[in-house]
């Protein structure tokens, strides 16, 4: 295995351990990026920050199919803060996205990958 394959395998292992700890109500990773780097757009036009949260930020049909007023609105900003400070869910996509944008997890993944190759 090459370095990239090893690092990706380590990332998957770290991701699984984070999810397992979150499932046990042990907040391991705060700072979720749901609603900041990702969003959900339903077939009805509802814009949501996350698939798990029962929160609708607005409907794209009400803004002439323009996302910006919803994305930059007060409700979206409020939920971003709430998610970043209090969310530690088990939704793999959000865990993975958050890992990619937090140096702590990038360094941990790289360190474990390099250690595996030694």
Language-model-derived ranges and their functions:
Residues 1-108:
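Accessory C-terminal segments flanking Radical SAM cores
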Residues 108-118:
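Iron-sulfur (Fe-S) cluster-binding modules
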């Amino acid at each position: 295995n090459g370095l990239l394959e090893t690092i990706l395998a380590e990332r998957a292992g770290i991701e699984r351990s984070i999810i397992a700890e979150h499932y046990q109500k042990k907040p391991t990773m705060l700072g979720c990026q749901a609603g900041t780097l990702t969003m959900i757009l339903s077939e009805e036009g509802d814009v949501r920050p996350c698939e798990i949260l029962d929160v609708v930020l607005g409907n794209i049909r009400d803004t002439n199919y323009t996302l910006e007023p919803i994305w930059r609105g007060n409700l979206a900003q409020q939920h971003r803060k709430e998610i970043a400070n209090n969310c530690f869910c088990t939704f793999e996509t959000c865990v993975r996205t958050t890992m990619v944008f937090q140096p702590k997890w990038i360094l941990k993944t790289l360190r474990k990958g390099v250690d595996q190759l030694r």
